[in-house]
Amino acid sequence: MSAWAAASLSRAAARCLLARGPGVRAAPPRDPRPSHPEPRGCGAAPGRTLHFTAAVPAGHNKWSKVRHIKGPKDVERSRIFSKLCLNIRLAVKEGGPNPEHNSNLANILEVCRSKHMPKSTIETALKMEKSKDTYLLYEGRGPGGSSLLIEALSNSSHKCQADIRHILNKNGGVMAVGARHSFDKKGVIVVEVEDREKKAVNLERALEMAIEAGAEDVKETEDEEERNVFKFICDASSLHQVRKKLDSLGLCSVSCALEFIPNSKVQLAEPDLEQAAHLIQALSNHEDVIHVYDNIE
């Protein structure tokens, strides 16, 4: 088992054991499959797998509170649909418009339906398969030495890069090669906190299922509608296999995708936290940006 996976499951097990009290031992985690590193660097990334984050970090630390302050519901809903459309276009570009032969597209359409996205909006995004969009991954440094990865889909890579650079420079950040080293590409399965029989699943049980399914970690999170969910993290090559196993255990998976998970985190002082939140919000508001990852604790 990799050090990352062992440490992650150990932390999750510790959380469960603290809740259960002394004298109780958790089952040992199972070895995950070997990792396959992703290429690093900025610019176009051909063959990239679809990404959509259906959940956002939850918790009671300052970053969780500052990072995810939302605007009016109608504005937030429009933003979510806009990012979903980008993901549809990317999935179609990479695997074609037929969800029966494109598992990434099938996954994102499943998320669209769960968010009650209008059918007409979905169909419009599906018809843009002939657009000259390019997937882009930019590396940056934010306030306090934080690392940022910015995913984008654009038909003008030069303009998009100039825009991203301007937003970073204006808000205490900078383009910086090397930020990718602070993240690992992992499979992420988002699961409801109730199983198919509508019975609540606690973190202890989720940890047991993570071990059984071959996941490396499980975290309690909230989705963008502030509903509690679990995030199961696994090796990228095992994503669909782990999801299938979790479903067979009676869980209700909401989505699965590849995400950049930080392998090291930084703590920021209050002024840097606020500036980082403003920077990430500004980046996220750009029409070409799919998602912004950070390693802030």
UniProtKB/Swiss-Prot annotation:
Q: Give the record's keywords alphabetically.
A: Activator, Coiled coil, Leigh syndrome, Mitochondrion, Primary mitochondrial disease, Translation regulation
Q: What is the protein name given in its UniProt record? A: Translational activator of cytochrome c oxidase 1
The record's principal subcellular location, in a coarse class, is mitochondrion
What is this protein for, i.e. what is its function? Acts as a translational activator of mitochondrially-encoded cytochrome c oxidase 1.
Where is this gene product found?
Mitochondrion
- Residues of the region (Disordered) are 20-45
Biological process GO terms, please? mitochondrial cytochrome c oxidase assembly; motor learning; regulation of mitochondrial translation
Family label: Belongs to the TACO1 family.
What is the species listed in this Swiss-Prot or TrEMBL entry? Answer: Homo sapiens
Q: Which GO terms describe its molecular function?
A: mitochondrial ribosome binding; mRNA binding; rRNA binding
Recorded coiled-coil stretches: 191-227
Cross-referenced PANTHER family, in alphabetical order? Answer: TRANSLATIONAL ACTIVATOR OF CYTOCHROME C OXIDASE 1
**Alphabetized SUPFAM superfamilies for the sequence:** YebC-like (SSF75625)
Tell me the organism's taxonomic lineage: Eukaryota, Metazoa, Chordata, Craniata, Vertebrata
Quote the disease note of the record. Mitochondrial complex IV deficiency, nuclear type 8: An autosomal recessive mitochondrial disorder characterized by slowly progressive cognitive dysfunction, dystonia or visual impairment that appear after an uneventful early childhood. Additional features include gait difficulties, spasticity, dysarthria, hypotonia, and variable intellectual disability. Brain imaging shows white matter abnormalities in the basal ganglia. Serum lactate levels are increased. Patient tissues show decreased levels and activity of mitochondrial respiratory complex IV.
Q: Where is the composition biased (Basic and acidic residues)?
A: 28-39
Cellular component terms (Gene Ontology)? mitochondrion
